[in-house]
């Protein structure tokens, strides 16, 4: 949480932290500015003191809404500095930072964070090391200050996540109702029984994705990563987004993975349901029941303070007890259980904590954390895959709550 930033600075022995970027491209900037639209800002944080937001004069009104101390970037005008340095923009950015830190009396260990192309970031950090005589430039690769702070959410963040969850679940409910309302046509000329669109033509994945988009517009949601609506063998490849030309055939496994956020950015929701229209093949039904059993087992055993990697091991061992291959004993397998169980969720679709079972993963389940639970089985050669995914919140009392109330029924009824 934001209230932990001073503690995290102290734990890292940092005298200050500098964050660069824009609300739209840097989750850390969005986090610190409460999502107010700002571009190309510099944020200076020092223990026990208000944060300083250095911003373009054109954005002074939005900057004032953040509650931070504000300063106009023209006080350290980058163009003027670049002219002094004969047009060397890299040297100018480093010199601008030197002047800012000097004016605020910052010296010692300073961590640098934000967003940028890797080459540009490396060049700037290297130049800063050369330019900042009184500063030790500190960078973090894993579990950095703000990644760690964002693992736990405060009441305002949870309210935002509940809000986007409600809207996302409304979209999924509307889609399920639409699919169930469509009549089915008997197969002909080699095609199988499938749903019909309102114009009497076959309903396709393209139609479904357009419907999802329209529902998102109504709910004020956007899908920066698209969505997954994959049928049959495509559902057997976890991140296959689906073939737009595919017909909505009865009895085929459908994986619908939906991960929207509010228009303009904000907190994500992430949910997956597996459906079969009208009826389900026995093999799909069995895989679904086994996956539902894993999901319930994980939910029943969630515990504050327990290593997150333990839940990946629990999942693999349960699936293996049912003779499914998993990545625990068959690394690289493309059938069976092939991915991680869960991931943190927030301003990014994948964030800390990690639930992967590797030696260096020391993450534990924490109060205030929000994460997915998403076991699944994949058999592209057999023409199906199944996955079930909810978003889970651990409250301050250590109780766990699903933020994804939409039913987990495999079968979607269709009109006769």
List each language-model region with its residue ranges.
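Active-site neighborhoods and metal-handling regions in enzymes and metal-associated proteins
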Residues: 1-416
